[in-house]
Amino acid sequence: SKISKSLNQEQNKYKIFLGGGDTVFSNKLSFTITSIGFANDIVYRNKAKINDDIYISGNLGDSYMGLLVLKNKIKLNNLLSKYFTKKYFMPNIKFELLDQIKKFANTSIDISDGLLADLDKMINSQKLSYKLFLKDIPISNNLKKILDFKKLSKINYISNGDDYQVLFTASKNKMRI
């Protein structure tokens, strides 16, 4: 079936094992996924240090734009609509960066609830403060064009979540990726 082929592709892509399933009768399709694993070197989300730099592994905001397209809250041409809805349904999780990040990150978290919400979880749990420069927060060229053309606020798009980029801090003297 198409579902089992897709699950097989994801297992190969992310080097995971699908160990079983839970079958229930329903007239709707439903999935529940539980992930269990082991880690030798854990980067916790509450170990930021004073004067750490803040990093983001990739662009923010595309997923939220995709959600707005799906909810018919914003109209875009067909090509851009497909681009953004794909980002919403299939975020590009950068697993290949994780080994590099854990070499020097003091703390990290995935951006699932939005940049500001997840940064607050990571930093404010330690009663630290932070300063962000909006111009330095990465967004795609597609999103930049739309924000400029429609005169929309960047902060609204980077703060809504579902981007699944890695947000992390590292000391200034650490080597960068």
Predicted feature locations:
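Helix-biased detector of long, well-ordered alpha-helical tracts
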Residues: 1-177
